[in-house]
Amino acid sequence: MHGTRPSLADITLILEEIPEIIDLHCDEQFDSSEEENNHQLTEPAVQAYGVVTTCCKCGRAVRLVVECGPEDIRDLEQLFLKTLNLVCPHCA
């Protein structure tokens, strides 16, 4: 376009091949067993967590490693915040 206002003479249409229209919808259906397998893959896996706390008798550091899921490690944390205490091997 030239000038401050567009006019029809300024517009040039270049017509080449018309793009092919493609259907993007997927009509594929899964068996129920495949859906269950896919659901199982997305569940959280068991993971190792290092826990460091203090002995309730002498105050020494007590270290342990647990394997559990994310929800279980939160439950363990809640137990430590409430009444669960660990005792070191020296005080046991």
Swiss-Prot record:
Superkingdom per UniProt: Viruses
Reply yes or no: does the keyword Transcription apply.
yes
Q: Which UniProt keywords apply?
A: Activator, DNA-binding, Early protein, G1/S host cell cycle checkpoint dysregulation by virus, Host cytoplasm, Host nucleus, Host-virus interaction, Inhibition of host innate immune response by virus, Inhibition of host interferon signaling pathway by virus, Interferon antiviral system evasion, Metal-binding, Modulation of host cell cycle by virus, Oncogene, Transcription, Transcription regulation, Viral immunoevasion, Zinc, Zinc-finger
Q: Which GO terms describe its molecular function?
A: DNA binding; DNA-binding transcription factor activity; protein domain specific binding; zinc ion binding
Find motif (LXCXE motif) and give its ranges. 24-28
Q: How is it modified after translation?
A: Highly phosphorylated.
The segment annotated E7 terminal domain runs over 1-43
Subcellular localization? Host cytoplasm; Host nucleus
Keyword field contains DNA-binding: yes
Q: Where is this motif: Nuclear export signal?
A: 73-81
- Point out which parts of the chain are unnamed zinc fingers, as ranges: 55-91
**Known function:** Plays a role in viral genome replication by driving entry of quiescent cells into the cell cycle. Stimulation of progression from G1 to S phase allows the virus to efficiently use the cellular DNA replicating machinery to achieve viral genome replication. E7 protein has both transforming and trans-activating activities. Induces the disassembly of the E2F1 transcription factor from RB1, with subsequent transcriptional activation of E2F1-regulated S-phase genes. Interferes with host histone deacetylation mediated by HDAC1 and HDAC2, leading to transcription activation.
Copy the domain comment.
The E7 terminal domain is an intrinsically disordered domain, whose flexibility and conformational transitions confer target adaptability to the oncoprotein. It allows adaptation to a variety of protein targets and exposes the PEST degradation sequence that regulates its turnover in the cell.
Assembly, in brief, is:
Homodimer. Homooligomer. Interacts with host RB1; this interaction induces dissociation of RB1-E2F1 complex thereby disrupting RB1 activity. Interacts with host EP300; this interaction represses EP300 transcriptional activity. Interacts with protein E2; this interaction inhibits E7 oncogenic activity. Interacts with host TMEM173/STING; this interaction impairs the ability of TMEM173/STING to sense cytosolic DNA and promote the production of type I interferon (IFN-alpha and IFN-beta).
Family in the record? Belongs to the papillomaviridae E7 protein family.
The name on file for this protein is Protein E7
Organism of derivation = Human papillomavirus 27
